Amino acid sequence: MEQISSLNIPVRGTPMTVDAAMALAINEAYKGGPRVSPNPLVGCVVLDSQGGFVSAGHHEFYGGPHAEVNAVKNLSAEDLKGAHVIVTLEPCAHEGKTPSCAKMLAKLPLKRLTFGLIDPNPLVAGQGAEILRQAGIEADLYQADDLKRDQEMRIRLEEVCEAFLWNFRQKKVFVALKMASSLDGQVALKSGESQWITGAESREYVHYLRACYDGLLVGKGTIEFDNPSLNIRHPQIEKKNKVVVIDGEGDLIGRYTDLKLSNEHDADNVFWCVAEDLKEDVLKKTKKLSKTPQLVFVKTKVGGNLDLEDLLAQLYTLGFRSMLVEGGALTASSFVEVGLVNRLYMFQAPIIMGSAGSKSWTETIRIEEMKNKIFIQHPTYKTFGNDFMITGRIQ
């Protein structure tokens, strides 16, 4: 997920290639990060008949106008005569919370439309493009000038709406894991102390990430040691987030109203996950509380640990489409071990903590042969102050 930024929008009339316009459309799409779920992030750029930049737009919030509408809403028929529209995702053909973008565009005096990805819904895939063709507008799938560039852009186009694509194809929650460690991979002292490993710049970016996912998940250890608020504190974002807590044995539910998060969040926005075998005991504990979070009773595996696949399946049913896991070492490694993490955000600070008195976030993951090592695919890197971050897909 890209950082919120002040994009360098070209001056009107600036010549742009289709590749450059698509790259700008991708960057534009990320502006909607905190507000569009469960819809995909989409960006759109309009070029005039001579290939000069005219305007850009993005899908700003769920239920609001789509990127194509925002890109053309302030343009006249003369501005759009012979224009070329570049958009990251095929214009929608169906009527939903908003009218069909394809039908809207078909009424404009455009010459051409280029879209980055075909609509993933097989029932409507290609229909948006066909509506435009029937109106006499060229509509084609984006292809970069050379093979390497095309592969790179294809990856970027998939990444910009990766949670949406995962939801549609798999009907599962898209899971991202955020970790912060020292150079030697330590995430906390053995006492549990971990504040702070990374700097203020990294932590601000994490609050941006919190806003971009439907929920924030932590384990009970994080609650016990840090008593965190788990809210979003970012200078550019005002948003109430949802929190998921894994407390398999229900140890902390009786103290819920004493926790900071109970004051920071409406009870309906907190989801407390406990073993289904303990349902009766947990319900007894919650009767004594003045307010109660939403309870999620989860199947257990051999050994008593919660079945994380069942947990995610229940969260999907409850409306979650993406989740940022920020839990401690045990929570993080548990999700990685069972192959449930789609994307990793790994922040590292230029410090060394040493393994003798610290904990690694992978200490429960055991790999016997190098051929079984875990790969981070399509990694990208960013710096935040003195820290750096690597992010990529885990396969």
Residue ranges: model-predicted function:
Residues 337-376:
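Flexible, gly/pro- and Lys/Arg-enriched active-site loops
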Residues 277-278, 363-395:
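Conserved histidine-centered catalytic loops in small-molecule metabolism enzymes
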Residues 166, 170-318, 330-333:
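Active-site ligand-binding patch in enzyme domains
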Residues 41-51, 179-180, 390:
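Short beta-strand scaffold segments in enzyme catalytic cores
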Residues 25, 43, 92, 132, ...:
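Residue-level signal for inorganic ion chemistry
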Residues 17-37, 167:
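Short, basic/aromatic recognition patches
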Residues 46-153, 242, 276, 302, ...:
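Zn2+-dependent cytidine deaminase-like catalytic core
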Residues 120-123, 224, 251-253, 279-280, ...:
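Short gly/pro/ser/thr-enriched loop/turn and capping motifs at secondary-structure boundaries
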